[in-house]
Swiss-Prot record:
Protein name stated in the entry: Gamma-glutamyl phosphate reductase
GO cellular component, one term: cytoplasm
Function: Catalyzes the NADPH-dependent reduction of L-glutamate 5-phosphate into L-glutamate 5-semialdehyde and phosphate. The product spontaneously undergoes cyclization to form 1-pyrroline-5-carboxylate.
Pathway membership, UniProt: Amino-acid biosynthesis; L-proline biosynthesis; L-glutamate 5-semialdehyde from L-glutamate: step 2/2
Enzyme class: oxidoreductase
Annotated keywords: Amino-acid biosynthesis, Cytoplasm, NADP, Oxidoreductase, Proline biosynthesis
A GO molecular function held by the record: glutamate-5-semialdehyde dehydrogenase activity
One GO biological process term: L-proline biosynthetic process
Bilayer-spanning residue ranges: none
Coiled coil: none
């Protein structure tokens, strides 16, 4: 079978499955999730065995230690996948909820019903556990899924797919509710993002290059998660003890995550009080620092920040620092250089905090809290499929609700409209 025929078949199967999933009961979907968890447990030896092939191939190709770590499937990570399925099963099912039902002057009632998007294509790299994250969220939200994992995780993903299908079928749901492409041909990605007749939305998870390419070439709407160039602004009316704790947590909790602080902005009037202490603590943690001329004059031996630094998501123990004259300058800097992901203000002034929340154009805006809280679990959504930096359709952490839409429903009793 040609690649085009294969992809068309996958698309047709997904579309047919989506019609059945849209009317599946919450009980049936939860049964499938628990059955998937049981199938993963039973397949544990096979998962480890197939992952070993991917790890061996990865080492042969010279993948670095960070990529190999993402690729690894050990007992702890398999336990995490199983627990993740059970957590998604415990989440409220949004499908079928009717809200904003009102009587109108004509006598009809109008409301909105929560419905699935339909068929979701998910393209991702390296981490095989994403296969379970994506499959579980899409299934619970009533969507059929076509998954295209990275070629480096091919054997792991195929083994996971077998367990997923076994669980879905055991619960009486359509066999093709979740499909993992069984080809490493890169042309499959191009086809997947060009099938609007079968696919309703694409969710890419991976590096900036992958996401930009898909966004540019797709003929299907894309929910994208681009850079996490996150800022913390320390205001002149900040509690400096809180500011110190927030800045340290936002930067050093984890370096390689999208909600880590990459740039620190400090009001000029408090820079001399907090920067020397912060710089020392960050350098003690091994963080490489670059800053503007004012920062360097206050804080001693740190590198000079370039224009490129202000735009950069380091995903590493590195931080850029800038002193600003006021909050307006901080907001202008964030809106120019930031990635619209997550930005924070530390201030005891309510009016300033409100203005910052209103004017900063990001998917999450924090007041007196670390950027590290930008996360589906921390927001009470349960699992997430990513953090969208778009404004349409979903924005911020994308959980079950972000994988749904709404349609209007109208109730009448023989009502007709006058001419």
């Amino acid at each position: 079978m040609s690649l085009e025929s294969y992809m068309n078949q996958i698309g047709q199967q997904a579309r047919a499955a989506s019609r059945l999933l849209a009317k599946a009961s919450t009980k049936q979907k939860n049964m499938a999730l628990f059955a998937m968890a049981e199938a993963l447990e039973n397949a544990r030896p096979r998962l480890v065995e197939e992952n070993a092939k991917d790890m061996e191939n990865g080492r042969a190709k010279g993948l670095d230690s960070a990529l190999l770590d993402r690729l690894l499937l050990d007992d702890k990570r398999i336990d995490g996948m199983i627990e993740g399925l059970k957590q998604v099963a415990s989440l409220p099912d949004p499908i079928g909820e009717i809200s904003d039902m009102v009587y109108l002057p004509s006598g009809i009632q109008r409301g909105q019903m929560r419905v699935p998007l339909g068929v979701i294509g998910i393209i991702y790299e390296s981490r095989p556990n994403v296969t379970i994250d994506a499959a579980s969220l899409c299934l619970k939200s009533g969507n059929a899924t076509i998954l295209r994992g990275g070629s480096e995780a091919f054997y792991s993903n195929q083994a996971i797919a077998e367990a997923v299908t076994a669980g879905v079928v055991a619960a009486g749901l359509p066999e093709h509710a979740v499909q993992v492409l069984n080809t490493t041909d890169r042309e499959a990605v191009g086809k997947l993002i060009s099938m609007p007749e079968f696919v309703d939305v694409i969710v890419p998870r991976g590096g900036k290059g992958l996401i930009e390419r898909i966004s540019k070439d797709a003929r299907v709407p894309v929910i994208k998660h681009l850079d996490g160039n996150c800022h913390v602004y320390i205001d002149d009316e900040a509690d400096l003890d809180k500011a110190f704790a927030i800045a340290m947590n936002a930067k050093t909790r984890r370096y390689g995550v999208c909600n880590a602080m990459e740039s620190l902005l400090v009001h000029a009037s408090v820079a001399g009080d907090i920067l020397p202490k912060l710089v020392f603590a960050l350098q003690e943690k091994g963080v490489s620092l670059v800053g503007c001329d004012q920062v360097r004059s206050v804080s001693g031996e740190i590198g000079a920040a370039t224009e490129e630094d202000w735009y950069t998501e380091y995903l590493a123990p590195k931080l850029s620092i800038k002193i600003v004259a006021n909050m307006d300058e901080a907001i202008a800097h964030i809106n120019k250089y930031g990635s619209h992901h997550t930005d924070a203000i530390v201030s005891q002034n309510y009016t300033k905090a409100r203005a910052f929340m209103t004017e900063v154009d990001s998917s999450s805006v924090m007041v007196n809290a670390s950027t590290s809280f930008a996360d589906g679990f921390e927001y009470g959504f349960g699992a997430e499929i990513g953090i969208s930096t778009d404004k349409i359709h979903a924005r911020g952490p994308v959980g079950l609700l972000g994988l749904t839409s709404q349609k209007y429903v109208v109730l009448g009793d023989g009502h007709t409209r006058d001419n």
